[in-house]
A protein has these predicted regions:
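The serine-hydrolase catalytic nucleophile loop
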Residues: 33-46, 184
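Short alpha-helix in the alpha/beta-hydrolase fold that links the catalytic acid
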Residues: 42, 168, 182-191
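Alpha/beta-hydrolase active-site loop
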Residues: 73-89
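Hydrolase active-site cap/lid region
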Residues: 113-151
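Short beta-strand/loop motif that positions the catalytic acidic residue
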Residues: 165-167, 172-174, 178
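Catalytic histidine-centered segment of alpha/beta-hydrolase-like enzymes
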Residues: 206-218
Length: 231
């Protein structure tokens, strides 16, 4: 049964979410850029939570999916603020953050902001610093559909230029042939993380979406393995 659609307010923005009660740690899914909580990976993870009795939270950033607002007004800082509020207000205890593409970038920031609560991270085609390596400048970003405000916000939240002071287990899954997020970004992220427990799984022939059945299976097996100590 699909969890009921609900909303919470932050700064006058109505953020849509679905929460499935269960035992912890709570799984929290963060969608990618221009995506939402009803995508295939989110639904497969929700089904996994149902089968295993896990609590799970998924939500839409403002301007996406069922949340209020205009997509073009969104910035990485704004969506980080909403993501932090969702974790703080809607979950208790330890969480496992699962981020797709841009959502992976946000999970890194959440782990830095709430190290005492984040038990593990899973980055699916994680796109850390994509405003940095994806575009030469604000004008290039704008031509590709990324607003100037979003680009500036992303530049202020870059992580890959130094050590990322995260110590929890981190799992990165990345497609060998990802056309949107170069595989090198996954290697850079792995090297930048301070944690000694970091694993990168390169999926042969995989693209960016990683939504094929065998790719979904790899994601679910990764999440399940991280949860084993909590069984």
């Amino acid at each position: 049964m699909t969890p009921e659609l609900a909303h919470f307010d932050i700064g006058g923005r109505e953020i849509a979410y679905r929460y499935r009660p269960g035992r912890g740690p709570t799984l929290v899914f963060l969608p990618g850029y221009a995506s939402d909580m009803e995508g295939n990976k989110a639904l497969e993870l929700d089904a996994f939570a149902t089968r295993t009795g896990r609590a799970m939270l998924r939500f839409d950033y403002s301007g996406t999916g069922s949340s209020a607002g205009r997509f073009e007004d969104g910035t990485l800082a704004l969506w980080l603020e909403e993501s932090l509020a969702a974790v703080d207000r809607l979950t208790d205890g330890p969480v496992v953050l699962i981020g797709s593409s841009m959502g992976g970038w946000l999970t890194l920031h959440l782990a830095l902001l709430r190290p005492e609560r984040v038990q593990a991270l899973v980055l699916i085609a994680g796109a850390a610093d994509f405003t940095d390596w994806g575009f030469e400048d604000a004008e290039t970003a704008e031509r590709k559909g990324i607003g100037r405000a979003f680009w500036r916000s992303g530049q202020e939240l870059r992580l890959l230029s130094g050590e990322i002071a995260i110590d929890c287990p981190v799992r990165l899954l990345h497609g060998e042939n990802d056309p949107d997020v170069p595989l090198d970004v996954a290697f850079r992220t792995m090297r930048a993380l301070r944690s000694a427990d970091v694993q990168l799984n390169v999926l042969k022939g995989g693209g960016h979406r990683l939504s094929e059945p065998h790719e979904i299976d790899a994601i679910l097996r990764t999440v399940a393995a991280l949860l084993e100590p909590a069984l």
